[in-house]
Amino acid sequence: MSTLALIVEDDEDLASIFAEALHGVGFTVEHVTDGRSAEERLKKGDPPFLILLDMHIPHVSGGDLLVNVIKKEEHLAKTMVIITTADARMGETYGEMADFVLIKPISFVQLRDLTSRLKPKDA
């Protein structure tokens, strides 16, 4: 089973922290910085096991990406989604479409511990 995690985050420093936490528990990581790039990546190529999705990203919002791509593309049906946002109301709005909601600021340890529990056992 794939252990690919796609980080959709426009803050490069935060994306680096996320990538380090995911690498630390055995995930392979790809990173895109905006919704348009994420949409292109998700519509072609192998589906990731996990998407770490910032809700406030340029070009196509995380909410639009979640509603119009992630939840509509059949090949992404088994992809786990963790949304990240500093806006608790946005987390509530989209929370039912995601597997987890993390409210920023998110610590390295918090993300590492969560993703280590989500990683496929056979990976």
Give the ranges of each region predicted by the language model.
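Conserved acidic carboxylate
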Residues: E9, T85
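Two-component/phosphorelay signaling modules centered on CheY-like receiver
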Residues: D11-E30, F100
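Acidic, metal-coordinating helix/loop segments flanking the phosphotransfer/catalytic sites
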Residues: H31-L50
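Active-site residues of response regulator receiver
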Residues: D54-H56
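Alpha4 helix (beta4-alpha4-beta5 surface) of REC/receiver domains from two-component response regulators
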Residues: D64, A86-I103, V109, D113
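Short amphipathic alpha-helix used as the core "switch/output" element in two-component signaling
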Residues: D64-A77
